[in-house]
Amino acid sequence: PDDYMMKPFSQEQLRLRLLRALNRKQQLLPMLTAFQSADTEQVLVECKKIISQNSRYANYCRCIMAEIYLEQNRAQEAKQILNEGLAVRESAWLRLFLGRATQQLGDHDAAIVHLHSALQLRPFMVDAYRWLAYSQLAIGASEEAIATLERAVSISPQSGRLHQQIAEHCLSQHDYFRAKQSLATLLDLHRYAVDDNPQILGSYIHCVILHAINNQDPYHIGNLQKQVNTALSRCRDSLINHDFDFHTFEHICQARVQMARGNLPKGKQLLYKSTQDYLDTPETMSSEILSETILAMLQLGEFEFADQLQKSLPPEQAKDPLLTQCIQSIRSDTVITERRNQYQLSNELGI
């Protein structure tokens, strides 16, 4: 970027970079001022002015406009403004946003073509890999989607967003091992982000449990308690002094371990005992405790109760893609479904 001034080779190069950055800020000042004020309509007006002047920053403004249009679900208008830019000259960024626009319109095959074109122009464009994976997954090419994301991770290994996206895709395919690996990396990247840690930790433990249940090797079930305890121990110091009920969270996780090991009565008893102060008033629960309780109830087979609790989730938490995939994965997992059915049948028979 023009503003990037790390390790200039000479004073002259530094001077030129500063001049370019200053010139850019001056030309884009009205648009940037509107952007900072969150006045999206004025941003669109200023971008159109800059584009009409055939400025060197015209394509940059087209991308800004496309981003706003996509946020407002106006993909057709975004597509039009991007095609106008591509008619002048090819651009990786315009191709990226055109891929996103066609993706929002539901044409995933065309989106894949545009995103591949962007990557041919810029092979290290991580965002293009991310959106390409969404379209590949939408057309059923799940392995290609995961491979695309793994390629992006090799370029940007510190990107938490990429690791979370891999985990979401793997959960949707019931590939708990790879989801667990990605979440372990994500947990490590967020080890000092106390606000994000509980949700990531809960998702990681969820994947550890489902991987152990679905694996035919009894070693994984036998080692499950140790893995969960290790994960909880790693985050205990940072969370226990924070405004977070770590003890309840830990007991819910231990209840899920007991269920996974086949001891459903003990798991159920521990779950209800640890959450008894909250279940009558779920709105008083933190979103992390609530989401973990929902997953535990689903694992136990208490679908109606879980659905009631799910309605109490804060709006932003209810839309969280990682939590959504965790809930969907446990609802559709065949091994857990068989165990629940067997447990319910035993109860009906009085066993």
Which sequence ranges carry the predicted segments?
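Charged, alpha-helical scaffolding/interaction elements associated with membrane systems
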Residues: 36-37, 72, 139, 261
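Flexible loop/N-cap segments at domain edges
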Residues: 78-289, 293-296
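Receiver (REC) domain switch/output surface
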Residues: 13-25
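Alpha-helical tetratricopeptide repeat
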Residues: 24-35, 59-64, 92-96, 130, ...
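C-terminal non-catalytic interaction modules
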Residues: 288-351
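A Lys-centered signature of the CheY-like receiver
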Residues: 7
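Short, glycine/charged-rich "phosphate-handling" switch motifs in NTP-dependent
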Residues: 2
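CheY-like receiver
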Residues: 22-65, 69-71
